[in-house]
Amino acid sequence: MRLITLFLLLLLLAIQYPLWLGKGGWLRVWDMQKQVASQNQRNAELKQRNLKLEGEVKDLKEGTGAIEERARYELGMVKDDEGFVQFVAPAPKTSETPLPPPAALQPNHRH
């Protein structure tokens, strides 16, 4: 009886091996599901990027407004009747009095 139980246990393990570790096993299916979810997320991101690029291409093909806007911001274009004005942040104020030398450079006065 003990031999039959051992044989059935080994047979059960032999049947379970492909289910868990085989080509179509649960572990492989679980890994594939993670890969599919990751790829679906990447596809959604790329779809949004493509829609944005498609809109830019459409604007560039149909009108000069997009081209003019791009030239103004990226190349600094101005029209003939316009003037170019650039705002610059003010420089930080420096103190008028010179800074004293560091303590290591000051002479030691001993009395």
Curated annotation (Swiss-Prot):
Gene Ontology cellular component annotations, sorted alphabetically: cell division site; cell septum; plasma membrane
For this protein, the parts annotated as crossing the membrane are: 4-21
Coiled-coil residues: 28-64
Bilayer topology? Single-pass type II membrane protein
Its domain of life?
Bacteria
**Stretches in topological domain Periplasmic:** 22-111
Per the record, ranges on the Cytoplasmic side are 1-3
Can the keyword Protease be found in this entry's annotation?
A: no
In the record, biological process GO terms are: FtsZ-dependent cytokinesis
**Which InterPro entries does the record associate with it?**
Cell_div_FtsB, FtsL/DivIC
Q: Where is this region: Disordered?
A: 90-111
Q: Which controlled-vocabulary keywords does the entry list?
A: Cell cycle, Cell division, Cell inner membrane, Cell membrane, Coiled coil, Membrane, Transmembrane, Transmembrane helix
Protein's cellular compartments: Cell inner membrane
Concerning its family, UniProt says: Belongs to the FtsB family.
Assembly information from the UniProt record: Part of a complex composed of FtsB, FtsL and FtsQ.
What does the UniProt function comment say about this protein?
Essential cell division protein. May link together the upstream cell division proteins, which are predominantly cytoplasmic, with the downstream cell division proteins, which are predominantly periplasmic.
- What name does this protein carry? Cell division protein FtsB
Source organism per entry reads Ralstonia nicotianae (strain ATCC BAA-1114 / GMI1000) (Ralstonia solanacearum)
Q: What is the lineage of its organism?
A: Bacteria, Pseudomonadati, Pseudomonadota, Betaproteobacteria, Burkholderiales
What gene is behind this protein?
Answer: ftsB
